[in-house]
């Protein structure tokens, strides 16, 4: 298993490195930590799909890429703070095998065969979390700061509901399962 924790700008570089090292050989299973979307031929492209496309273009045909999704910050993980993630692969057996391998008493893993749904959700969740985080400032301007401070959760709840709905639409658009958004 090779774990790829690179910036989204490094996808081309890592494809080149994998081709150099594994030219003519089987590439081990890959696990992408990198999140995001790219544009290819005027369409959104998941970074796992981009890496697969680049490797295929370079003649590597046997590629098995998994991805990690979920709220997990490196600093928390380094300090063994309880974290929960999902390992996704189009082959559920591979996803389970990797999830079992990585699971610890503080790094809790589940698994999914909805690679697209997990990747899209992971890539866009922070956009929606920022909107929810802005709820305090977005709630009614017709109330005092004191009342707003105590009652902004109605606005936050409405934003969470709308965010989930929009994530489901986007996930389905990129060929994932909308159920994956809710876990």
Locate each region found by the language model.
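Internal alpha-helical scaffold of NAD(P)-dependent oxidoreductase catalytic cores
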Residues: 21, 54-64, 82-180
